């Protein structure tokens, strides 16, 4: 089994504090692991994470959108969880909200600047994923490193989209109306404050129906990639 490395840094600690500073949670953590997927930290059925010198094991299932979720012995989804893997790294954010907490969803994404380089594939991806306004934002804010800027902007979309997974599952437990939206309907609107929000009417209408009042995103650089965490709140 390949050696597993737990990535720690003051930047990741600060990211966790910022992501959950306005959320009432019993516990929450952002974990980044380096190693091949095959070493077993993440398998279809469970994820094992380092925790204060020991380990935590979450039983993991996947919904119709392939979003991971975990339930306790009573079959209740008390812990919110999201996963992302990229270039040999696995990132996880999990949180156990207090009763009555406004936190309803979490999302995480590792986005590589290599996907947004000057190659033909990179150019096609940026054209597909971003509006003119988003191109202007990235060019104005990340002019010295455009591929990283696009990775941040893409990671914000993906993480925000993932943060709606738990509210969407809750919606379908009592509704038959299909809510249709994708990650392109979200946008990083303020890279200095790292705010994310729904961009168009389709996504906003879905968020309103699910009771999501706001989605915040935070990001740091990890191994040259953008690590973005999103938190969804109902107030």
Name each model-derived stretch.
Residues 1-235:
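Core catalytic alpha/beta fold that binds nucleotide/phospho-ligands
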């Amino acid at each position: 089994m390949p050696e597993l490395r737990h990535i720690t840094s003051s930047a990741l600690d600060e990211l966790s504090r910022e992501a959950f500073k306005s959320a009432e949670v019993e516990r929450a953590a952002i974990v980044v692991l380096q190693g091949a997927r095959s070493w077993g930290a993440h398998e279809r059925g469970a994820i094992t994470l380092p925790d204060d010198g020991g380990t935590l094991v979450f039983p993991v299932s996947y919904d119709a959108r392939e979003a991971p979720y975990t339930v306790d012995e009573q079959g209740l989804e008390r812990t919110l969880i999201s996963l992302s893997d990229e270039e040999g790294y696995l990132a996880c954010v999990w949180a156990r909200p207090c009763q009555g907490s406004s936190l309803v969803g979490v999302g995480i994404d590792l986005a590589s600047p290599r996907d947004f380089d000057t190659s033909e594939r990179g150019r096609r991806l940026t054209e597909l994923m971003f509006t003119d306004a988003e191109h202007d934002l990235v060019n104005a804010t990340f002019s010295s490193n455009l591929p990283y800027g696009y990775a941040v902007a893409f990671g914000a979309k993906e993480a925000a989209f993932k943060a709606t997974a738990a509210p969407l599952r809750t919606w379908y437990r009592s509704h038959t109306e299909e809510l249709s939206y994708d990650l392109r309907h979200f946008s990083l609107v303020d890279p200095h404050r790292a705010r994310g929000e729904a961009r168009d009417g389709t996504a906003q209408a879905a968020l309103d129906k699910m009771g999501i009042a706001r989605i915040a995103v935070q990001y740091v650089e990890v191994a040259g990639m953008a690590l973005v965490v999103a938190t969804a709140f109902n107030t």
